[in-house]
Amino acid sequence: DGIYEYPMTIYDDGTQSLRHTQLTACSHREMEGLLWQALESGRRSFMILSHNFELLNTTQDRPDDVVVSRFRQLCSFLDRNRDSFRVRGFEGLSPDLPAQQPAPLKSPVWKTAMRMLEQAGRRRFR
């Protein structure tokens, strides 16, 4: 009792592949579009996965500039849109989960292509 499982927000990236919402897995454009889509479709929650180490490069000896930039852009976006998005952690949260996992959100393939280019550059210059 007192343990709850919160489903990850997932999306179709336009290539019929399902992805989860995470700073290392989504571009800022994808995340922003998905947040608006979730709000407009009446979703009660939007779960973003985050690990404490993901702002570092793979060798964990310096910041990952791409992921740090995504984090800053996400924080700025959420700050500018406080009237639309409520940000919170789990403490004191009363579960209000849907009976079934909602259908995946959808992101246009052009945003996926831009992310793939960004990821390729990120991997090349680790």
What is each of the regions a protein language model found here?
Residues 26-126:
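C-terminal domain-boundary segment and adjacent tail
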